[in-house]
Amino acid sequence: QADIFIRGGSFDQTMVLLNGIDFTDARTGHQSHSLPVDIDCISAVDLLDGVPGVGAFAGAVNIRTAPLKPTYLRFEGAGGQHGYAYANLSGAVTSGRFSLLAAGSYRRSDGYRHNTEFANYNAFVRATYEAPRAGFFDLQAGYQNRAFGSNGFYAAYNPEQCEHTLTALASLRWLQSVGRF
């Protein structure tokens, strides 16, 4: 878990965008960075200057996703001490004007001390289509399930603290040029 601070502003003053769509958590910016996208699906991270909208007093971060290659299928796995395990399945298909990127992952650990365990599930899909006359369509959807112990994070006298967050997001964007504009 981490917070984003830009130019002295807090996480509540920083907008988080995924492929240009605002997914800032309206309840608390503390969870805004918890997007259901694995690092190998990220093609770039842009730091946007100025104030692109409400909730972006300090600035904005745009996370862009793109396939690693036009067409691929990839499985990745890892393991380590304290019961650490990681598995990721991702792939993409690109054909002409259509592109599909999909990924799912699981990451867990028993923790390095009492009540520092975690289990994270991510699923993300993005499909784009450039229609000759109808315009550009961009659909993305994701789901995340995170549970983790936070031993002493909120109060040192209570080591039995934990958090569990569920995130579901989706967007459909349509871009169409009109006339010569």
List the model feature ranges, each with a label:
Residues 1, 11-13, 40-42, 56-60, ...:
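Extracytoplasmic
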Residues 109-116, 130, 134-181:
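Flexible loop and strand-edge segments within Gram-negative outer membrane beta-barrel domains
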Residues 21-49, 64:
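Short acidic/polar hinge/loop motifs at secondary-structure boundaries
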Residues 1, 32, 58, 84-86, ...:
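Transmembrane beta-barrel architecture of outer-membrane proteins
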Residues 15, 44-48, 60-66, 72-81, ...:
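Predominantly transmembrane beta-strands of Gram-negative outer membrane beta-barrel pores used
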